[in-house]
Amino acid sequence: MSRVGRKPIVVPAGVTLTLNGTELTVKGPKGQLVRSFHEDIKINIAENEVIVERPSDNKLHRSLHGTTRALVSNMVTGVSEGFTRTLELVGVGYRAAKSGNGVTLSLGFSHPVEVTPEEGIEIDVPNQTTLVVKGINKERVGQIAAEIRSLRKPEPYKGKGIKYSNEVVRRKEGKKGK
């Protein structure tokens, strides 16, 4: 039995779950998320908890069990608390500025880079070298943060680039002189 899949999901106050066939709708104070799941996996909604069950121990059902439980848990957390990813810009002249709905990044290119988030995702700029990506969908928040990071990945010699706030950039020693 999946150790992740066995755990019940505690539903906080103010969050409602609706199961329509294989489609689960989660509504909360921050918004609403809808997702379809595999028809073999059963999602039981009780008063303040959700239990995910599988019909058999075959390989497909075992793999779907923990995955489904994690996805439902992320949906519940997203609509109640939301998710954030913090990025830091390291390097001389690397800065970010809020522009309308999106962000303008100066990353050492000959042109500024415009990043416009999709609906449901918000990018804050607390200071010139920090970006905070916020949203209710964990996958989309992580994906947009990864796309921003990929514009200028941290390099190993000086550490310049865009990195996650908790990321440790492995440093290399430069060439040896004579």
Curated annotation (Swiss-Prot):
It comes from the Bacteria. It holds the Pfam family Ribosomal_L6. SUPFAM superfamilies: Ribosomal protein L6. Transmembrane segments: none annotated. Disulfide bonds: none annotated. One of its GO terms (molecular function) is rRNA binding. Keywords: Ribonucleoprotein, Ribosomal protein, RNA-binding, rRNA-binding. GO terms for cellular component: cytosolic large ribosomal subunit. Gene3D superfamilies: Ribosomal protein L6, alpha-beta domain. InterPro entries: Ribosomal_uL6-like, Ribosomal_uL6-like_a/b-dom_sf, Ribosomal_uL6_a/b-dom, Ribosomal_uL6_bac-type, Ribosomal_uL6_CS. GO terms for biological process: cytoplasmic translation. Part of the 50S ribosomal subunit. HAMAP family: Ribosomal_uL6_B (MF_01365_B). Belongs to the universal ribosomal protein uL6 family. This protein binds to the 23S rRNA, and is important in its secondary structure. It is located near the subunit interface in the base of the L7/L12 stalk, and near the tRNA binding site of the peptidyltransferase center. This is Large ribosomal subunit protein uL6. It comes from Brevibacillus brevis (strain 47 / JCM 6285 / NBRC 100599).
